[in-house]
Amino acid sequence: MKHFLTLRDFSKEEILSLVNHASELKKEPKKLLQDKTLAMIFEKNSTRTRMAFELAITELGGKALFLSSNDLQLSRGEPVKDTARVIGTMVDFVMMRVNKHETLLEFARYSKAPVINALSEFYHPTQVLGDLLTIKEWNKMQNGIAKVAFIGDSNNMCNSWLIVAAILGFEFSIAIPKNYKISPEIWEFAMKQALISGAKISLSHDKFEALKDKDVVITDTWVSMGEENEKERKIKEFEGFMIDEKAMSVANKDAILLHCLPAYRGYEVSEEIFEKHADVIFEEARNRLYVVKALLCFLDNQRGRE
């Protein structure tokens, strides 16, 4: 069964097809999943992700069932595989936002319904699909190639972008603090994909080096959910990594800024630059709705072929 746990499991053609279908559904909504049911399991808070999934399945003609971790027997120690074997037989899709990626993998092993990663500590693939749709809409993909810089933490967003850039053949530069590292296993995967796609991938600790000649600039919060106790330390470590006017001036003249939100002005991005690119950033957030629609349709079609 096809799940959506990481973009590593998807081909270039499948990723681009998802983005193109999302664009079509944005222009012409259709009820393609009449009476289908989506279970939404959250171990972490969510604003945009919950809204995107709940609206997506509803507008496609189905219905959503919201389940926080406190609503489930998982919170009392029931094995993940047992929960998966119950929920996965009652619904058509399962969306999960989890603390540990292993929870997703375990759930997917036992679920009879496709499982979607709505965020884990390693990956945030639905967000990257929304980013790709936004890049397409702002005409920052020329001949199938985008020039992208990611500035910030070597987190789930960085990992997901590294993977998709390598698969799609993008020019992609990462800038992270000196004591931060990319997962060796994810980096190895990306390098192998880059040999196939022709992607140009670089890693540095200098944001200006990464930003040079880029059309798309991506940043993310320095303090992810669950890292609140590390805030003071991380702010010190990320000193100099803010995206401000000086940083954006190094990128190409009409470069756009993307941020998955929530944004913390004065830390990863300046107030001035955030507001300057607010139209793009909030359309990026809105685009999550349409890529989720396309994803649900894709998984439903894949399941129908089995």
Swiss-Prot record:
SUPFAM superfamilies: Aspartate/ornithine carbamoyltransferase. It catalyses: carbamoyl phosphate + L-ornithine = L-citrulline + phosphate + H(+). Its main location: cytoplasm. The keyword Cytoplasm applies. Its EC number is 2.1.3.3. It comes from the Bacteria. Transmembrane segments: none annotated. GO terms for molecular function: amino acid binding; ornithine carbamoyltransferase activity. Belongs to the aspartate/ornithine carbamoyltransferase superfamily. OTCase family. This is Ornithine carbamoyltransferase. It comes from Campylobacter jejuni subsp. jejuni serotype O:6 (strain 81116 / NCTC 11828).
